Amino acid sequence: MTLHNNNTTSPLFPNISSSWIHGPSDAGLPPGTVTHFGSYNISQAAGNFSSPNGTTSDPLGGHTIWQVVFIAFLTGILALVTIIGNILVIVAFKVNKQLKTVNNYFLLSLACADLIIGVISMNLFTTYIIMNRWALGNLACDLWLSIDYVASNASVMNLLVISFDRYFSITRPLTYRAKRTTKRAGVMIGLAWVISFILWAPAILFWQYFVGKRTVPPGECFIQFLSEPTITFGTAIAAFYMPVTIMTILYWRIYKETEKRTKELAGLQASGTEAEAENFVHPTGSSRSCSSYELQQQSLKRSARRKYGRCHFWFTTKSWKPSAEQMDQDHSSSDSWNNNDAAASLENSASSDEEDIGSETRAIYSIVLKLPGHSTILNSTKLPSSDNLQVPEEELGTVDLERKASKLQAQKSMDDGGSFQKSFSKLPIQLESAVDTAKASDVNSSVGKTTATLPLSFKEATLAKRFALKTRSQITKRKRMSLIKEKKAAQTLSAILLAFIITWTPYNIMVLVNTFCDSCIPKTYWNLGYWLCYINSTVNPVCYALCNKTFRTTFKMLLLCQCDKRKRRKQQYQQRQSVIFHKRVPEQAL
């Protein structure tokens, strides 16, 4: 923020008003003569404040005792709330592992900057207002201004970093999120603080040595190089108006992209419902399989080896044109495979126009299910009938559909031609058992992996449709959860950005007005505007709690001192589980 000095001893611009300088009628007055400005009595003797008779010093700066009590109480409460709120943010980040996300690292940095403002800046500025003069010396003045400006600018820089992080996370989810690590977030946070320090601290501390003298009068505290309104106007543009403009544009883009993704998710859910009703035939007429969604979700790869059999359905397609007689035979042989919907439900997601004539596409659906009788299958050379493959939903394990498409050379021969174009004639089933090594040694190696050929019936097609529906719903659920997280992060950003604009705008508007009229703004307004900038540090933790349920729950737990109880409950639960485990081990050994 930009400090200004206008008719006051606050760290505001020093040269905006001539009321600090005695007019012609005051020329030649001896030291100690008192000049009155409203309700404040300002002495010419080294900036000391005195009573109207000029004999006694006034530590209250001309304020009444009730004014001092009111100012001290109000500002003290605000400073205390700021300190407690930001300490809660830091402690919550420490104790709750759910809050240790990349986005919350930026909020942690913002909380540190706000804590510095609550501990140092607020209290020193309150003392400055009450005493109506700076009584701590030049070094303390420069240190206070340096800390205040660096922390305030770091808050703005952190808001910029958060805005860019949200923007790239929404618009470039695949490329940016792969690089979005805690280490990279730490580098960005460090750059925000280093840039803020380089911009303000050296100039504030050493400007008097650069120009060869100190022009700040005793009893006052302001930045020496901000003695010209035009310079102050430029710093206000760079420190406030430009960042606010950038953050507003980014937030608007984030909002539009979030709305777009919401509509896409609604369309995905609607298409899933229609596909279920129409046996996976896309509304546009082109058939789509669940594998097209798997290409968009590369994270759906899990292993299920324990007590699970792995069943590979190899659906082989052939691009060739059947004869009319063969079409008639197929029409009379099987109603299930004459159903266009059934054929389309198992068709590869790639369009026939994109395939070369004579090429063969092999789509592999790897369906992991819990086969109750897999040991029996291994001990027998005969495969179970198709009825055994129809497993109830409650017995299904993790469904992991993986599509692997590859173009192969055309087969040299076909068995008496095909039944219909792009149909699935044969179903080779390959069973890989995950039994223990001891059991596997008793089984002949030739029977360990049994391959047989069965005619593909409508039951297998129904089973595949059921698995595809389940996977489609899982993908939609993942997208919906991801979108909810993005919306929550966007809500937190919008609340922080709104609070920043509301609290910082009044003071920066006064800076613009002062450029054209240096005596139009009373001193009280300057003090209120500057304090309002500090209140932004008070509001930020409230924004976190209102927009983030995890923060809110952790704050409540910390304020009610329930942290130890939660830890004890977790330890007791772990002990109970350990006892249950040790009881079961001897029973299983017997």
Curated annotation (Swiss-Prot):
Main location per the UniProt record: membrane
Ranges in the topological domain labelled Extracellular: 1-67, 131-142, 207-229, 515-526
Any Gene Ontology biological process: positive regulation of smooth muscle contraction
Entries under Gene3D superfamilies matching the protein: Rhodopsin 7-helix transmembrane proteins
InterPro entries, per the entry: GPCR_Rhodpsn, GPCR_Rhodpsn_7TM, Musac_Ach_M3_rcpt, Musac_Ach_rcpt
Localisation: Cell membrane; Postsynaptic cell membrane; Basolateral cell membrane; Endoplasmic reticulum membrane
Single annotated GO MF: acetylcholine binding
Keywords: Cell membrane, Disulfide bond, Endoplasmic reticulum, G-protein coupled receptor, Glycoprotein, Membrane, Phosphoprotein, Postsynaptic cell membrane, Receptor, Synapse, Transducer, Transmembrane, Transmembrane helix
Biased composition regions of type Low complexity, renumbered to the chain: 334-345
Membrane topology annotation: Multi-pass membrane protein
Modified residues (Phosphoserine): S385
Glycosylated residues, chain numbering: N6, N7, N15, N41, N48, N53
Superkingdom of the organism of origin: Eukaryota
One Pfam family this sequence matches: 7tm_1
Primary role: The muscarinic acetylcholine receptor mediates various cellular responses, including inhibition of adenylate cyclase, breakdown of phosphoinositides and modulation of potassium channels through the action of G proteins. Primary transducing effect is Pi turnover.
Family note: Belongs to the G-protein coupled receptor 1 family. Muscarinic acetylcholine receptor subfamily. CHRM3 sub-subfamily.
Assembly behavior: Homodimer; the dimers can form tetramers. Interacts with NALCN. Interacts with TMEM147.
Name of this chain's protein: Muscarinic acetylcholine receptor M3
Phylogenetic placement of the source organism: Eukaryota, Metazoa, Chordata, Craniata, Vertebrata
